[in-house]
Amino acid sequence: MGEETTIMGTVLSVVFQNEENGYAVLRLVTDDGELLTLVGCVPCAAPGENLTATGSFSSHPQYGEQFSASEVERYLPSNETEILNYLASGVVRGVGPATAEKLVARFGIETLQVLESEPEKLTAIKGMTARRAQEISAAFNEQMGLRRVMEFLAHYDLPAALSVPLYRRFGANAMAALERNPYLLSDSAFGVDFSVCDEIALSMGFGGDASLRTEAGLTFELSHNRDAGGHVFLPREKLLAATAQLLDCDVDAVEKSLDDLIAIHRVVQEGVANVTACYLRQSWEDETYVVTRIEAMLADKPDALRGVERVIKEIEREQGVQYAPLQRQAVELAAKEELLLLTGGPGTGKTTSVRAIVALFERMGLNVLLAAPTGRAAKRMGELCDRDAQTIHRMLGMTFNDQTGEVTFTKGEKEPLEADALIVDETSMVDLSLMRALLAALRPGCRLVLVGDPDQLPSVGAGNVFSDLIRSGRIATVALRDIFRQAEQSMIVRNAHLVNTGMPPKLKNAAANDFFFLPRRDSVRLVETVVELCKTRLPDKMGIPADELQVLTPTRRGDAGTRSLNFALQAALNPPKPGKQERRFGELVFREGDRVMQTRNDYDVVWQKEDGTAGTGIFNGDVGKIAKIDPSGELLEIVFDDRTATYTSDMLAELDMAYAMTVHKAQGSEYRGVVFIGAPCAPSLMVRGVLYTAITRARELLVIVGDDSAVNKMAENDRRSRRYSGLKWRLRKGGEEK
């Protein structure tokens, strides 16, 4: 990239336009008469527009010189020729070349003003009805609205790409919504820091409107603690104190605004256990709905399955197994109960139990569905059970509502799943909102078996659902504890169970062939060792290719964090070479062959499978491989398991390298080999749950590199971050009232 400069010019043609995120490739004639290609975020670009763009020039072998724009300021066409080109491009719905000629011939330089505010004049054109005139005017004003939003964002140095989700949410009212309440930008859908929103609001003259600011601060604290901390609610006193600190004001000033929000039902206040709990309304509705549905399932006794004992014996005989007492109990309870929780660590026979339950249900003529929270977990579940398994989102028919910016599901109470039984694996990853959607999609009488390991890290989203369901004591639960003889030979399994009981793992064991510890206290040597393991030692000596190894670390920061490790691993495993395309984005260089990870939910990414099946949505934590980068560097083809998605270069902000990832991001996945960094890090991450989850990600081989004292400290530290949730309390309370 060259030095940053500013150019001015007129759009001649639109080579490419991504309607979802506003990314465009434009042919431009500059005010100096030069022809060039401009790439950047220019939503709804059209020929005839005048632009002032800030950015830098770069050169590509195939496409020549390009100008990559970081900021774009747009102006309406200023003469009749430019207006004609602009309207003839089709940028305004209902206006084609012929209509554009008639409009400009009639109104000349005033054409755009007529379209914006005097649509009744359009009926002077032959064949133009009053209704069509209003439709064309509305379409034009929609374009102007988007332009004004972009100008607003540019004025406050916010990315132009924000205009797309804003316009999706508010449509033609987007600018009015921002002018009415700039704090809406702090919503998690837009992700602007509250302090930035505060500065914008003050510059817009909102300094005197204390209630708007305090209400925004309160809802920000509730949503931020939900999204970042997993809290379903906050205690009233904690919410007031946190908001007062955020706004640098007295608690008394915040308290009235909280009561106002409660009065209009944007916040729900309710006694939960011994706490005065404050919920965002949606969180309260999710929690109470889950409780209501579970209470209904507990009250309902499904139709009895006859001959269960006989069928179990038949399955044992056919599969050549004999179920342990707890496994048999799990199968029997699945036949009797509408809701069953099945838990257990590695090697305790969860998979065998699930297979038995599936076989029993199918023998009894039930239609069985299998699902898991992530694509990798669903794929593994399907392979182990020799059945089709889907992600929960796909099973429920997830869709993204462009108007509200919300995720919705086609399956629900009005259109339930066609299933007599549903088995969900990795349930500890299911957050409260997804559990609500799942329960809503079950028809009355459908059996539900939730399988998981409550000792792993909780869901990324709000709540601690699986653990709360277990600890409520209301739901039939089978906890598999005994390690089977075959699994007992594995040091991975044995050490996982040691850690889970608070004992340090056995790091030195000459007889081990699947668990190794390499002491490295110096960070430079640690990184060198990790690179050596992944590049040569483990592929050569253990027969596990680098593509099937995963480096896990508790943290993103520091020498032993994902950032440093990914730089080192990319340089070793996928170095640059002639003919291999790459694209720089910030401090990262994305290269063909790189392993990458999606870092946020993007419901608009279009993907396709080899069989032609297509869909949308790539989610936070999905890992893929860059198969191809267009020579221009503007389009990337990424393969996520069996799905291929095309990314434009401005979408690279959603990606990170994935040679190394945090343990949290690895939840729900399993790898042939894992290299875990057991080095000192932030106290909040030096906990048993992180170590246990890391160990249980390894299927065939685990190598811990680091400091034995740090590993032992993690095993001993059972501190779990508290998540405010009323689910367990509500279920217990419901049981006491019966």
Language-model features: locations:
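Conserved helicase motor core of SF1/SF2 NTP-dependent helicases
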Residues: 360, 364-366, 372-384, 393-401, ...
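Conserved helicase motor core of P-loop NTPases
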Residues: 454-616, 627, 734
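Hydrophobic anchor at the beta1->P-loop junction of P-loop NTPases
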Residues: 342, 370
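Accessory, non-ATPase domains that flank or precede helicase/AAA+ motor cores in DNA-metabolism machines
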Residues: 1-307, 316, 738
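Hydrophobic positions on the alpha1 helix immediately C-terminal to the Walker A/P-loop
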Residues: 353, 357
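Conserved lysine of the Walker
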Residues: 350
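C-terminal accessory regions
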Residues: 613, 620-738
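N-terminal pre-P-loop "Q-motif" helix
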Residues: 320-336
